[in-house]
Amino acid sequence: VSDVQAGRVAAPKSSSGAAAARASDYFEVFYRSALKLIRLGVAYVDDLSAEEVREYRGTLTEPGRNSPYRDRSVDENLDLFQRMRAGEFADGSKTLRAKIDMTAGNINLRDPALYRVRKVHHQNTGDAWPIYPMYDFAHSLSDALEGITHSLCTLEFEDHRPLYDWCVDKVDLAHDPELWQPLVDAGLPTTPSKPRQIEFSRGNLNYTVMSKRKLITLVSENLVDGWDDPRMPTIAGVRRRGFTAAGIRLFWERVGVSKQNSTIDMSVLEGAVRENLDGEAPRRLAVIDPVKLVITNLDAAHHESLTFPNHPKDESFGRRSVPFSPELWIEREDFAEVPPKGFHRLKPEGEVRLRGVGIVKCDEVIKDANGEITELRCTLDLESRTGMPGADRKVKGTIHWVSARDAVPAVVRLYDRLFDVTDPDDDTDGKTYKDHINPHSRRVVHGYVEPAAAGAAREDRMQFERLGYFVADMHDHTPGAPVFNRVVTLRDSWAKQS
């Protein structure tokens, strides 16, 4: 339910109005429906073992054979089924089967089982039922009871649709209120429908696996951090990653629904989320690989508040105060001692514009005993500040910063694609999907954020300027100890690699 609510749709409700429906709520209705099928002469109790059933069923190229118990009378079948309900028979000794066509080309129609004897404790009904309905029978009737009009499922259920329709048509709940009277008696008003099953292709994405079995393995073997690991293709996972419901809906609008199995590029999903966040996420300043920059021609005690827009394209987001002081944190990659060709950020004796402040020139590079750069000493061109005559002076690069005096230390998790190959399901090279887990899919760094970012509520999304879109972690983030997950980069960083 929480996953569905995260998609900003209504919490699931049955036609009874219950917050969540369970098949076990309908066990009495299923039982009455089975009795009806027996009375109609289209269901019978079979004594064949599971192995014998497989033998009699036939193959894709050979028709099946009728069970020797197929022609039992209605009275005998009613008696046997009621005794099954009473718990007189051992597990697996009898089944209730639909009487359809043992020569049908669709094997699902070769007298499928509707009920079996299974004396197990049920989490909702306890030991009340020694028999349980089979999936196809329970699924179709549950849809009808819940007023479902269209039951959507993936292509592997296409061959099951004729059986789905058979169950719905033969039981005909909509015109037989006596069958669902137990729900009414329990105060659960019900308006059955005649549902239609529609199949579509599974939404496969590259760089991930969608198999439930493989996802369970990833969790059980601690290859990920649980079902809500932001790298997992689960609702809980993409929610914690920070993907928006609107972004996911935009993605599905773009790729559409089809019956053709295909694999969708992960960049399409990320692009839809990125597009949504571009218009919805306020901007904040953060530095995730910090090096200190000291402005030497300002008094060490200098401190002021600058006004920044929360969104460059939407004035309705308002403005905020950003503290500024002579000691700043900037990104380490925004300085190059020996700059490559085309580098337009800070370098020795070079100039760059500090976002919202003015132009600084790097005068001195301070290193530690290991040769690691620890500090950049710069002078600020005071004439280049906002409102001054030189404010429009042009330099090629602009970089962001965070005031060291006011910065809040933050943990930043940089998530990427879980696998390093486009099709981790492909095992033709002798490797399994577990061999292709991307070792760089989760990287944790420690940086600094401006106070407005630190004060975000859990699951608040924002753009860290020049870095990407981030979300305050739904479990670990607090204003005093902020934790952010990267949702997506500002651009498709995989495009150059593929």
For each feature predicted by the language model, list its residue ranges.
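Short, compositionally biased low-complexity segments
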Residues: 1, 52-58, 134-140, 220, ...
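Active-site cores that bind ATP or allylic diphosphates and position pyrophosphate for catalysis
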Residues: 6-22, 33-215, 282, 287-291, ...
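Basic, alpha-helical terminal appendages of large translation-related enzymes
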Residues: 1, 7, 13-21, 25-28, ...
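Generic alpha-helical structural element
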Residues: 26, 70, 87, 127, ...
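Long, charged, mostly alpha-helical binding arms that flank functional sites
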Residues: 193-272
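Short hydrophobic "helix-edge" motifs at membrane interfaces and signal-peptide entry regions
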Residues: 125-127, 232-235, 456
